[in-house]
């Protein structure tokens, strides 16, 4: 069952997003995990691509565009949007989903739904609980650098203009979820109804409570 999650960030350090994607982080604190010498630990397996960055580093490209349009200069501005598409762990063995295939799907999703935005697309082979759920991170600069067609989730003319910003409204998020469902149907992958929920669905708060409880039990068993 593929899921879609959205996070908005006011962090002006665009390099932090790429650091998270490339290096190991603690799943509870979200801080980098360091080795015995205090160095960052690279993730063992991932796929990473940039879109609309003109051959530049994602962070540099975003900062250049922000300065050009005089946007994202205030502390309270949302600088980037982070979307995560997580696939069902069974999609690998049952439906032939690979990291490369998921990366291609993520890039296509980004191009179709976030045109005109500088973006990072990165696929990891595993989730927080090591259950094998391949997932794709899509990080976009909130600023749009090119004029784009009026897409179904947009509700005002400014949503198409270069120099204006992406807005993840409730209606937009519902649309993106419906598109994830359509993608899974088209690709023959497992899917649940993301719009109406599931009686077996676990909320983020419940998931992390369970994870922290299990981690505490694991520590006790080692002592």
What are these regions (language model features)?
Residues 1-223:
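N-terminal nicking endonuclease/strand-transfer module with a His-rich metal-binding environment
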């Amino acid at each position: 069952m593929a899921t879609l999650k959205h996070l908005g960030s006011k962090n002006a350090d665009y390099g932090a997003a790429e650091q998270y994607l490339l290096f190991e982080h603690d799943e509870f604190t979200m801080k980098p995990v360091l080795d015995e010498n205090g160095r960052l630990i690279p993730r063992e397996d991932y796929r990473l691509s940039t879109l609309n960055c003109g051959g530049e580093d994602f962070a540099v490209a975003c900062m250049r565009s922000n300065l050009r349009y005089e946007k994202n200069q205030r502390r309270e501005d949302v600088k980037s949007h982070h979307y995560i598409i997580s696939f069902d762990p069974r999609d690998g063995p049952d439906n032939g989903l690979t990291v490369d295939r998921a990366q291609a799907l993520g890039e296509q999703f980004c191009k179709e739904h976030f045109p005109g935005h500088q973006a990072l697309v990165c696929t990891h082979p595993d989730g927080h609980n090591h259950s094998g759920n391949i997932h794709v991170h899509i990080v976009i600069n909130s600023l749009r650098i090119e004029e784009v067609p009026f897409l179904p989730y947009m509700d005002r003319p400014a949503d198409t203009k270069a120099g204006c910003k992406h807005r993840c409204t409730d209606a937009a998020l519902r649309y993106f979820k419906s598109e994830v469902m359509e993608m899974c149907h088209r690709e023959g992958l497992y899917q649940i109804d993301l719009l109406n929920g599931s009686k077996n669905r676990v909320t983020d708060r419940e998931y992390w409570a369970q994870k922290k409880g299990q981690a505490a039990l694991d520590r006790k068993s080692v002592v």
